[in-house]
Curated annotation (Swiss-Prot):
Organism: Actinobacillus succinogenes (strain ATCC 55618 / DSM 22257 / CCUG 43843 / 130Z)
Molecular function (Gene Ontology), one example: RNA binding
PANTHER family: RIBOSOMAL PROTEIN S9, SMALL RIBOSOMAL SUBUNIT PROTEIN US9M
GO cellular component: cytosolic small ribosomal subunit
GO process annotations (BP): translation
SUPFAM superfamilies: Ribosomal protein S5 domain 2-like
One of the Pfam families matching this protein, by short name: Ribosomal_S9
Family: Belongs to the universal ribosomal protein uS9 family.
Protein name: Small ribosomal subunit protein uS9
Disulfide links within the chain: none
NCBIfam families for the chain: PRK00132.1 (NF001099)
Record key words, sorted: Ribonucleoprotein, Ribosomal protein
Length: 131
């Protein structure tokens, strides 16, 4: 892929990271050499990926080439959305306020809380017995 007339954005969510390249085209989305429909079986994940493009009404004007690794389905979808948002802002800075208002620009910093010693999970304590 040539560097001319393409824009790039990196997105992260949980333990997933996505590299997104956008260039003028007809709306084809390729994720790890597979189509969006093949890569994400769940409609919810596909919808999350499409959100920034639908917001700025560029769904059928740009082609997306995406590589994503790490994490699960939900984290990868969120990372791709974040990457698409950053690439769109590089493509056209005037899109930033609309994307910001929708909450796509902000990186979701929530992570899995670590398990603590003496507890069953991160916060789940053993049952308390008074007697």
């Amino acid at each position: 892929m040539t560097a001319a007339n393409q824009n790039y954005g990196t997105g992260r969510r949980k333990s997933s990271s996505a590299r997104v390249f956008i260039k003028p085209g007809n709306g084809k989305i390729t994720i790890n050499q597979r189509s969006l429909e093949v890569y994400f079986g769940r409609e919810t994940s596909r919808m999350i990926v499409r959100q920034p493009l639908e917001l700025v009404e560029l769904t059928d004007k740009l082609d997306l080439y995406i590589t994503v690794k790490g994490g699960g389905i939900s984290g990868q979808a969120g990372a791709i959305r974040h990457g698409i948002t950053r690439a769109l802002m590089e493509y056209d800075e005037s899109l930033r306020p609309a994307l910001r208002a929708a909450g796509f620009v902000t990186r979701d910093a929530r992570r899995v809380e670590r398990k603590k010693v003496g507890l069953h999970k991160a916060r789940r304590r053993p049952q308390y017995s008074k007697r």
